[in-house]
Swiss-Prot record:
This is Small ribosomal subunit protein uS13. InterPro entries: Rbsml_uS13_C, Ribosomal_uS13, Ribosomal_uS13-like_H2TH, Ribosomal_uS13_bac-type, Ribosomal_uS13_CS. One of its GO terms (cellular component) is cytosol. One of its GO terms (biological process) is translation. Keywords: Ribonucleoprotein, Ribosomal protein, RNA-binding, rRNA-binding, tRNA-binding. Signal peptide: none annotated. Residues 94-122 are annotated as: Disordered. Belongs to the universal ribosomal protein uS13 family.
């Protein structure tokens, strides 16, 4: 099993799909990595040579921010918004939608479950 950026890639999948298991690499980035390293995109992970795995690992380490580094940067950006007190930071702090969505109805994903209100007796 190939291990790149701290992630075990599934052996049976094509390398293009397997690279998307790494946080921060989607389909287009995976295609770019494969093109730059010269690996055949139809190759299964189990069929990769050790040199190809090393080339992929080297390219990802040198050129991309993935996994823990990327998660840390995203969290720092959100924390910075909250510290400077801008509108987006306030929305993050209050747990409300940040990008202008309505909140009169919906927005349950960000707001959490509705508070229980007791039924009225007649």
């Amino acid at each position: 099993m190939a291990r790149i950026a701290g992630v075990d890639l599934p052996r049976e999948k094509r390398i293009e799909v397997a690279l998307t298991y790494i946080y921060g690499i989607g389909r287009s980035t995976a295609r770019r990595v494969i093109r730059e390293t010269g690996v055949d995109p139809d190759t299964r992970v189990r069929d990769l040579a050790e040199g190809e795995i090393a080339a992929l690992r080297r390219y990802i380490d040198e050129n991309l921010k993935v996994e823990g580094d990327l998660k840390r940067e995203v969290n720092q950006n959100i924390r910075r918004l909250m510290d400077i007190g801008c509108y987006r930071g306030l929305r993050h702090r209050r747990g409300l939608p940040v990008r202008g969505q309505r909140t009169k109805t919906n927005a349950r994903q960000r707001k959490g479950p509705r508070p229980a209100i007791g039924g009225r007796k007649k």
